[in-house]
Amino acid sequence: MATHSLSFFFRVLLLLFLTLSERIKGQGVGINYGQIANNLPSPARVAVLLRSLNITRVKLYDADPNVLFSFSNSQVDFMIGLGNEYLQNMSTDPTKAQDWLQQRLEPHISKTRITSIVVGNEIFKTNDHVLIQSLLPAMKSVYAALTNLGLEKQVTVTSAHSLDILSTSYPPSSGSFKEEFIQYLQPLLDFHSQIESPFLINAYPFFAYKDSPKEVPLEYVLFQPNQGMVDPNTNLHYDNMLFAQVDALYSAIKTLGHTDIEVRISETGWPSKGDENEIGASPENAALYNGNLLKLIQQRKGTPAKQSVPIDVYVFALFNENLKPGPVSERNYGLFYPDGKPVYNVGMQGYLPDIIYTSRATTIKILNLWRVVMGLAVAWFILDMGDKMRMR
């Protein structure tokens, strides 16, 4: 009886493991881990959740030491953020970048896999000319500081931008930057090319649909079957808006002389709730958008103009953030509630432990526990099957 019970127990664990592995693959998908909330689980608990989901790429908006500490030896790749408020000082005083790296990155880099620093977020959208002028010098200061530490090959330097930098996005082959930004974007792109770092874009088809629901087919923005559109200049067919937006950015970059810079999606998502005028914000649409997007990522799909380059995406966001300012939608982009329950079904069922783990040793043990238990489950299943075969 005891043997039968254990066999059943491990079969259940094996089934759970196979189900989760089939539902979502970590490769190709990242998650934005925002923390503008007062009800989120501890970083140690989040580490267990992401491990159970097989998500191995995380983007932060800062360099929270508690998060980086909790993910020590976790095999999760981190993009850490350097906030807009640091840029002006770093642009004029490179030692500020050196100090920041020594305080925020160096204590963790030997244990936690930090692969990129995102210098500023949507700088051009601020219309703050001092801030815009500070972006490239600040990025250069950070890169120089990384070089001084011998980390320039291990950690890339980039920045995330809004699609507002484009003046034209339709058709994708005619994508172009706003004229007033070109004087800043040309040297910025030259720097990206020089250090071989990707250009990050925050792309939200939701906004296009919300603003023009009568002109933009819902199926086109939700990756559902639709007629799509054909670019008259290239004859390339687009069946979803996100890919069209990415290719429009590639076209804009090409107009400034670069075909050697990869575009990556640092944010995209769909809100599960919104204000009355935020048409399309619903759990049903959010589930369709993110669920279909995850399928495309797992298929390693490229855009029509870059078919050989699988899209690189960080989904926004891991949790609903109850303290974010702005419309209701801003607080409802999360895939999960703070208690670890899915906001809607996209085939992601993770495990968020109830206990708060605080020590590094305990956190590491918990992160490895999932792997150990699954290994035992597989081993027990094989042994059990072998016994049954011998009995026959």
From Swiss-Prot:
Protein name: Glucan endo-1,3-beta-glucosidase 14
Glycosylation sites: N54, N89
Active site: E122, E267
One GO location term (cellular component): side of membrane
Organism of derivation: Arabidopsis thaliana
Cysteines engaged in disulfide bonds, as pairs: none
PANTHER family for the chain: GLUCAN ENDO-1,3-BETA-GLUCOSIDASE BG1-RELATED-RELATED
Family: Belongs to the glycosyl hydrolase 17 family.
Lipidation (GPI-anchor amidated serine): S359
Single GO term (MF): glucan endo-1,3-beta-D-glucosidase activity
GO biological process: carbohydrate metabolic process; cell wall organization; defense response
Annotated signal sequence range: 1-21
